[in-house]
Amino acid sequence: MMSSDLRLHDEALRQATGRNVKVAVIDSGINAHHSHVGKLSGGVQITCDANGEIAFSDDYRDYDGHGTAVAGIIRAKAPGVALYSVKILQDRLQTESRVLAAAIRSSIANDIRVINMSLGTHQISGIDALRQACEAAAERNIILIAAGSEERVFPASFSCVLGASGDELCGWNDYAYTENSEVEFRAHSWPRPLPGSPQGRNLRGHSMAAAHVSALVARIVETYPRSDGNAVRETLIRECTRGVDVEDDALNLDPTREKSPADYRPKQYATSNRRERQS
């Protein structure tokens, strides 16, 4: 595991693993058979049925690879977490905002402590229901992390959500903080390397940065279990290895920032997932 290499100021955080912290990955599902993930503690798929109603099923398998890559980062940096898959992204990694809102409310009902959303939308349709779901989770002391960018993206731009973007200056162990920015936190924009595959062919971007932040949040929650969103945010700021000048922020953001999570085509990771399922 790479988690012991994190350069954290707090000794207690360095020793933490996220043990028993319930983390929901709202994404394309998770492949529990992938070596980067290991055991899952549960999962659900949430969709809209033929009548336009929210529907639930227990098939949260990942046929794309995006959610598995996200889960692999969290497992590497916080190996003790209890991972839950909440599958909402379907073909082309798309969904509706009301499905995301339902996923957040489902996570509330299942006593999730940390919600990772490596996704986002610029659309304002349905935004009120999404904001209300995020606020309901935050009121119950659930920490929400979402992928963002230099443009306004939801839910990362909500005040009750910790926004994270990929920064090309951040290595695997680095975190950066941007004061007076809607998306305050920066992190590494790559997942774990895939054996036998050049890293350049792997996923990258803001989605992966959100997972890096979620892993550190899980360690914070384990160490300081009564922390609310504000306390977790302050701890994150203290642990950031550098600050980012908001005027120079766009220069450091990962070059793939123009692509939203819905644009990713992680063929190499998906191929690896299929190969491991068959072995």
Spell out what each predicted region is:
Residues M1-K77, V81, C170, S197:
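Active-site core segment of subtilase-fold serine proteases
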Residues M1-M2, L6, I112-N116, E222-S279:
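C-terminal subdomain of the subtilisin-like protease fold in secreted/lumenal serine endopeptidases
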Residues L6, V25, T68-G72, K77, ...:
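Structured catalytic cores of enzymes that bind and process phosphorylated ligands/cofactors
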Residues E11-A12, S125-L144, F154:
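Catalytic-core regions built around general acid/base machinery
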Residues K22, A82, N141-I143, L162:
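Proline-centered loop/turn at the N-terminus of a beta-strand
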Residues F56-H122, Y224, L236-V244:
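Subtilisin-like peptidase catalytic core
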Residues N116-G120, A147, A211:
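A cross-family glycoside hydrolase active-site/sugar-binding cleft signature
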Residues E151-E222, R226:
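Extracellular S/T/G-rich loop segment that most often corresponds to the catalytic His/Ser-adjacent loop
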